[in-house]
Amino acid sequence: MYVFFASILMNFYTATTEMTLTSNRYTLVPSTNVGDSFSGKNAYADLTATVTFEDGVRTSMQTDSRVSFSISDGCGTFANSGNHKRLTIDSACRTSSVTVTAVLTLGSSTVEASRTFSIEWLQSLSVQLFYQDASTAFSST
């Protein structure tokens, strides 16, 4: 008489119901634009993709390989940065806004989220100098 035992390891997922995409900033400048040197202007943003499952569980999945990211106009790149997905705006980006989309597919369940980011370019800079009295403009030839 022979007795056989078999075991199967199966991963079960509850269906996903929604995804939200958030960021630490929503206004960016291209990576080589001089505006990146000014306070509060950055060429990158750290993204968080929070997924809600059918059972109510919410989890951040932005660095999970099953979540894919895309950006309109090919204006940026994505890379893992600690617990975030870092979006960096490409120096060749010549638009006033971009849309970032994250998509997660688990089994037959797919959720996606999109977020719009404003792009600013420093195109000109005007500097006016004054003497110490703060009322007489300095002029030089």
Q: Where are the regions a protein language model picked out?
A:
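Extracytoplasmic soluble-region selector
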Residues: M1-T141
